[in-house]
Amino acid sequence: MKRLLTAMMLFGLALVAGVQAADLQVGDMAPDFSLKASDGHMYKLSDFKGKRAVVLAWYPKAFTSGCTIECKSLAEKGDLIKKFDVAYFMVSVDTVEQAKAFGEAHNADFPLLSDPDKKTADAYGTLRDYGGSIGVVSQRWTFYIGKDGRIAAIDKAVKPATSAEDVAARLAELKIPAK
């Protein structure tokens, strides 16, 4: 009985620890990352700390319908976001080659970050198993990170068609300064 109780307690602690690691909240420090982008550069969140706010628009998979709509929104109406002193990226668990081809196909003038080992997606808690040919990819969530490196907002109900407008509205709401 004692062993069973101990095992149950350890299992419960493991579950709680797993949830806490993936359950980021507004006000938490954003997990640092170093990811290669579609433009060939490596980007580290820590390079922006104290300098600029950062937007990470996580998306499931390049060349799928919702992701294509979101990328087109950000590419075609990115001027709305560029008014703010912010670095913005789309991020997925696709390879950098897939991210580059996807960005080029939709005239994205912003970097698309690649997280093929899924470590950063796991740190942000965005991974989900969609099954079938999609498999384990990121959910469509957008993280707004302040200059202080803390999460200022999380959007878990992203609307791909109005992504650029919604990001710009949230940046204004968060009082991110203009350039």
Language-model features: locations:
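Positively charged n-region of N-terminal signal peptides that target proteins for export
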Residues: 1-4
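Bacterial N-terminal signal peptides
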Residues: 7-16
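Sec/Tat signal peptide C-region and signal peptidase I cleavage site
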Residues: 16-23
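Short, acidic, Ser/Thr-enriched surface-loop or helix-capping motifs
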Residues: 24, 37-38, 115, 145-146
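Short active-site neighborhood of thiol/selenol oxidoreductases, capturing the structured segment around
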Residues: 47-68
